[in-house]
Amino acid sequence: MSKFLFTMLPANDLGLPTRLVPIARVLADRGHDVAVFNPAPAPARLIEEAGLKNLPMPSRAMPDSWTDSAQVSSAWDVEQLFGAAFGSEEFVRASTALHVDLVRDFGPDVVVDSFGLFSCLAARILQVPLVSVLQGNFHPASDGFVWWKGERPAGLPSAAAAVNKVAAENGVAPVVRSVDLLAGDLYLIVGTPETDPLPATAVVAYIGPIVWQRGNDTLPDWVAALGRDKPLIWVYSGNPRYAGIPTPCDSIVVIRAAIAALSDAPVQVVLTTGYQDVPKEFSTLPSNFHHAAYLPGPAMAERCDLMVHHGGHSSVMVGMITAGVPADNPVMTEL
């Protein structure tokens, strides 16, 4: 049997883990030695409930990171996003060293990654085969998040200079763009050519929508008790707050808009927050709102009449493709 290490950008939301956990679970069920790495609270909860091993954060001092959240939330493409988030050479060096420790200590035969810049660089440094599991607009050949705006503007931020300095220190050839480091020995694209189009020259395998739900997962009785005399709307906010202060990446706007639009409507609303707490400003929800930190996505999508979400790729896969549920996704421009 083989050893597989699943890595990702360690964001505190469920978008990336919900595409990797199903693959990891299948490999573990087949007897392979499987580990996942995402210590953020919400992903860690999902990984634990899937019965998978989540590796701890390697012990290494890390510098403060500086991120331009406004540019991250409005980035033209992944290259600008990485430039806005990972422009500090000191942070790139420390993050790369941490991920080299992680990969070396576990000793995988294969790294399976989704959007983890530093785990991809670590795999190159240690010469471990890399499988990249990406949505179409994360792929290096993509036209970006706002492709309809035409030609990409010149002079957008890039992390290439910082990344190449650290890569050279570790004997890895430079890249033209930092996004090129996501290039795996095998590309698996979550979605279809219609939902996640790429140029014909991109050598990828489309694997369709990947969604997570344990085979025995069912909805709690209180959802069934809501009855069917009124439409059931599922509101999924993703992470309402990514930091102690508001940032442009927060999905709290989804909850605010849903309450404003639906609190007096003749509907039942189920609000889920992906293992996140409901923000304090919503300490008392409207009487027709019902909150759960997490519910199995495919089951909830099949039960609801309408899904309102933050525009995350995995949410689109759950609602529109898996269950054919009408959806409104007001935040992410690429969807």
Where are these regions (language model features)?
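A conserved, positively charged/aromatic
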Residues: 145-151, 180-182, 301
